[in-house]
Amino acid sequence: MCIVKYLSLIINTMTEHYSQLTGEPDFPSIEENVLKFWQENNIFKKSVDNRDENKRFIFYDGPPFANGLPHYGHLLTGFIKDTVARYKTMAGFKVERRFGWDCHGLPAEMLSEKELGISGKLAIEKFGIEKFNNHCRNSVMKFSKEWKQYVDRQARWVDFENDYKTMNSSFMESIIWSFHELWNKGLIYESIKIVPYSWACQTPLSNFETRMDNAYREKTSKTVTVAFELLESPKFITVENVKTYKILVWTTTPWTLPCNLALAISKNIKYCGAIIKHEMLIFATGYLKIFQEHCKKNNIEYQLYNQDISSVNLEDLHYKPLFKYFADVKNAFKILTADFVVEGEGTGIVHIAPGFGEDDFILCKMQDIPHIEGDTSNLLSIICPIDDGAKFTDKISDFKNMHVFDTNDQIINILKQKNLCFKIDQYLHNYPHCWRTDTPLIYRAMSSWYVEVTKIKDKMIELNKTVNWIPNHICNGQFGKWLENAKDWAISRNRFWGTPLPVWKSDNPNYPRIDVYGSIRKVFNNVKALEEDFDISSINDLHRPYIDNLVRPNPDDPTGKSMMRRVSDVFDCWFESGSMPYAQLHYPFENKEFFENYFPADFITEYIAQTRGWFYTLFILSTALFNKPPFINCICHGVVLDTQGQKLSKRLNNYADPMEIFNQYGSDAMRFLMLSHTVLYGGDLLLDKEGVMIKDVLRNVIKPIWNSYNFFTIYANIDHITAEIITELNELSNIMDRYIICECINTIHSIFNAMEELDQCSNNLGYNIKLACNNITKFFEILNNWYIRRCRSRFWSSEITQDKQDAYNTLYTVIYYMIKVSAPFLPIITEAIWQRLNFQKEESVHLSSLPNISNFILNNEDKQNIQYMKLITCICNYVLSIRSTHNIRIRQPLNKIVIYSHNCPDLLNLPAEYQNILLEEVNVKSISFKSDISDIASFQLKLNFPELGKRIPDKVKRLIFLLKNDQWKILENDKLLLGTIEAEHYVINNNEYTLALKVHNDFACTINLDQHLLGVVLLDNELSNELIMEGIARDIIRTIQHSRKDNKFNISDKIDVIIHTKDNIVKDSIKTWSQYIIQQTLSTSFAIHEEISDIQDINEYYKTTMKDKEVSVFLKKSHT
């Protein structure tokens, strides 16, 4: 029955069994309602509580700082975490999601300094540590409310009520316990070393902090080539009239020259000399060219010394100090040999300042430079005479209180005055900067406490191989290589707001003693508690300065005068975040059994730079404390940048506020955009500010899902249908129904396979969220553009037949299953549809389980059905491509297509019902098949001569001859016979040739499916008058339907239509196809007028003009 008659039966009798929306969906509004539903009904809590206590999925939520608003990187990480947690919950696991806050460290301290108007450690101490730390405590959660708003709006489920904070005493006690454990294992030591130092923050940094993000930036430094005057002439060098010998040294840090204590050369470098006036300058032969160019440019006359100078002749020679400050230091100011000296941009001789370079420090320590007798406590004041702000102390009297970077020019001027400056340059190089202040770092000697990572490095490398890294190249690449070069970790910070190091030392070096504590009160026999040695009744807070007040006499001092005082340092906040697996549970003081049963975590994710941050510190502490990896599966995602590849920043104004995006497009669209992008696996997401990419997701993903739901509800409500879930394929007979159910089942299997971690032999790492998203998109494209479109007439039939009921049940079933499996990836829109389609055995889709599809068993006919559907959709695409190439509109019917098969039985044996589908889809009247492809195309053979030349180089000329004579054929094993079997011939391997099929008709093209050639399709493009008139009729129908949509008519509205045209062909077409037009457009009345003046009440009509034709269409709602 036609749709007009069908709808005429139900007009004014419609009642909604399924909730539906009219007009365009307002997705942000829909999302707000869903969020409200979740909150009012405690859906998140129920989703956790309803799962089996003994079937847990452990997920670690890394703690962010709450002193700034979340950005797109946080949202991306949150979307991944939430998606995996939702998926595992629907898979039957209990997934607790406890939010955490990183409260200590530089971010909090710097914010407080800014708010209090103070700067530097001295200013803080003057202000008062207690008041400063109280301000840190109050300000650190400044944006926690905004964080919760962003997290809630992105539809991320986390437990804020039971959150953990690194500043809580329970968390801090677990930190000091872990330090105590490391101490007992011999993995903690105190040492003076060279560390990267932020003078702006007045604290050292970990070596891995200088490798995170874009810590290295381009910096232009002033370099100087300095002449150090030897106190004695080198051995075996005798030159008349040379009064002094000088060593040329190049440095990029002139400010370190006042602290020079030695020079270093290499045994593997040849040196030479050049005489200028009465001075010989000595340098590496590799520097000679630069030396000569400089002399030429500055008109400096020189004479080359004509013999090589061996390093042996230079070693142990002494030289005059450049400055007076440390001239009396013993065992200094001599030339040493070192392996780290290489020829490069410098002179082959390195200036050694042991307080400002790691190699320098190690070399001088080995050589006992400076030699200090007795107490060595003043070593740092000699080798590193700067204060916390990188200003010289009074040891460097001429530059006292000057920042080291501000002294370069003055130092160079002094060297010029002393005739010790040979050359000055500007040098552009990558230089580490403070990740917090963007200021260039310095490297300086400091006393710090270290975790001896090098002791456990081999075990970390071993455990790393047990982790499922995604992408998998992280294992042996970025993280694996980082572990191979792991260094000991400086964990102490000479700051204020942090967990204090639980170390007490004697204040008298004559009576040394160190006490390390691991708990506040005595809990374990093997863990030293503070209450054993101190009165802790007044200590309610482990922070400074309260814990600093715990002082006692040194038991090892018989005089009773020295005291045990806590070292002033606090922990690196990376140590705290690396401790979160156990510290959030107050392990081992509480939850001991729980932690030990469920460690390590099943899953973790952060952006890829955390391989040198949080992932790394987790790994160190987990290996050292528990001999286990901290997690089993890890996604390392990339970063979100603007379209120019620049970091998103307020200064550049190159991004939109995420909340504005949510309110305009919805968070599901943003979620799916990110989850379906390669950013999940370490790539960069270039996000446009205007929201173009998110609109694409709305159009291509969200709306198709909504449209399938909307189509079902409209017609199910019209028919008063209550659809049922299909549980077995044998309930269905229609090939379209069986096909879409099979596609649904296969899609669900694909999503399961993408998400589930399998054994490594399967090459499936699991957690392939992008692939799962692609499968969802692909299915709804098939559902809307194939199944629903192909089956519309079944839904439009007036009688409720079994076929019609099957169509409803089929559509209802695939929506039901796909909504469930899509819920983790699109949690809000799936919930909205779930509530409207009465799938409510469960209160929420997120309280349901992933689809159980075990009852659906695909037989051979189903598999063949899928293959045929795949085949005809493939052919459709090629035919439509030919139409597009030749500008033949799809609505224009054509006479026939011819399909030429190439070794494809499925093509030649295509059943009639599939042929009919194909013809309808491409709007063609008939189809024919041929088995001889040579009628329409020919193969072109190309030989891979580089490969053949390796195997049979002496036969290449004969191969060319046989090829030109077209003497070849394909063998069954995909090899090629060149020549004839009876005469000269060669067997060519499949990697030694390629075949290309060339068609001989512009209206033909090859058919390729899954990279296999199936044949050629030819489209007959000749048009008869009958075909032309039918095409015009279809154009008119489309014009009317577009006008209905543009003017927001309901799908059931009847209309009156008037066509205005003087075109005889158009009029003939309308007369011929009038009944078809009326049926397709719900027209009650239909008329043709040649003159506009003949149309009565024209103002009541909506007017549309057909493109490329002198035709106007007028329509209005019918009142009959």
Curated annotation (Swiss-Prot):
UniProt cross-references to PROSITE patterns, sorted A to Z: AA_TRNA_LIGASE_I
Reactions catalysed: tRNA(Ile) + L-isoleucine + ATP = L-isoleucyl-tRNA(Ile) + AMP + diphosphate
A matching Pfam family: Anticodon_1
Enzyme Commission code: 6.1.1.5
Residue ranges of the motif 'HIGH' region: 64-74
GO BP, sorted A to Z: isoleucyl-tRNA aminoacylation
Keywords assigned by UniProt, alphabetized: Aminoacyl-tRNA synthetase, ATP-binding, Cytoplasm, Ligase, Metal-binding, Nucleotide-binding, Protein biosynthesis, Zinc
SUPFAM superfamilies: Anticodon-binding domain of a subclass of class I aminoacyl-tRNA synthetases, Nucleotidylyl transferase, ValRS/IleRS/LeuRS editing domain
Cellular compartments per GO CC: cytoplasm
Cofactor or coenzyme needed: Zn(2+)
Record flagged with keyword Transmembrane: no
Assembly behavior: Monomer.
Comment text on domains: IleRS has two distinct active sites: one for aminoacylation and one for editing. The misactivated valine is translocated from the active site to the editing site, which sterically excludes the correctly activated isoleucine. The single editing site contains two valyl binding pockets, one specific for each substrate (Val-AMP or Val-tRNA(Ile)).
Family under the similarity heading: Belongs to the class-I aminoacyl-tRNA synthetase family. IleS type 2 subfamily.
Its job: Catalyzes the attachment of isoleucine to tRNA(Ile). As IleRS can inadvertently accommodate and process structurally similar amino acids such as valine, to avoid such errors it has two additional distinct tRNA(Ile)-dependent editing activities. One activity is designated as 'pretransfer' editing and involves the hydrolysis of activated Val-AMP. The other activity is designated 'posttransfer' editing and involves deacylation of mischarged Val-tRNA(Ile).
UniProt protein name: Isoleucine--tRNA ligase
Organism expressing this protein natively: Ehrlichia canis (strain Jake)
Underlying gene: ileS
